Amino acid sequence: MWYSIRNNQRMALIKQGYKILAEYRLVQDHLKNIYAIPSYASGLHWFGVIFVHSGIYAGSMFRFSILLPENFPDDTILPTVIFNAAIFHPHICPHSKSLDLGPCFKEWRKDQHHIWHLLRYIQAVFADPEGSICTGKSPSGDLVVLDEVNNLEALNMLAKSRPEYIKRIQELAISSRRHMYDKPMIEDPHYIIVEPYCAERHLRFMEQLKSPSWREATCEDDSPPAELLGHIDSSRQLDEDEANQRGKLQAATTDLQHGARCSVAQ
């Protein structure tokens, strides 16, 4: 009995690890200008960084962490997204630096949601902050704005004094670039490090791309990269993306679970 319980726990951990790895594969495949990777210490703690190239927040670089619940992805509890630095935004708490996921997610559903959905939402709130605080239109045609957000000061300034809001965000962008090359806050081999451009290293890398061995290693998937997703697209495109990603996730999970069974058998 004791051995059976231990074996079941081990199997559950292995399956969870492979599911998280499958999620990481989808993240690599789906988005640009936002990056996330599980930490070396725990698959439930992800490091992330976003480079904003359009909208009010253009020119900013923000680091963040994603904390997954213990029973991810089976738990309905939402993951937690926490930024490393304070960011002035209606959906980001000025004290905890956490992002409100409520406007897009009510609960986590493993058959519908994936980590790349979180990253896409993060891109959306920075690309279109005005759109992220609107819930629809009134019968008269006026936009209906959320009345409960993580940062009421940011909400009021964005709604009533947009020029002042933009000025504040421009200062934030300058500050974020100033800290772009800061040393890692945590000692983890998977922490995302940004380094200044080095011409010599760039030329060396470009030469490597020309080598036959490199082309052979990278020709497995010749599909075009996903375009930058600066905002939530139409429901039709979301449905197409979802169907495509579900197929890839199912294939990846099947292969990885086969590997998990082999590991337990050994």
UniProtKB/Swiss-Prot annotation:
A Pfam match: UQ_con
Every UBC core domain range: 15-178
Region Disordered, residue ranges: 216-266
Superkingdom per UniProt: Eukaryota
SUPFAM superfamilies in UniProt: UBC-like
SMART domains named among the record's database cross-references: UBCc
InterPro entries reported for this sequence: UBQ-conjugat_E2_core, UBQ-conjugating_enzyme/RWD
Similarity-based family: Belongs to the ubiquitin-conjugating enzyme family. FTS subfamily.
Listed name of the protein: Protein crossbronx-like
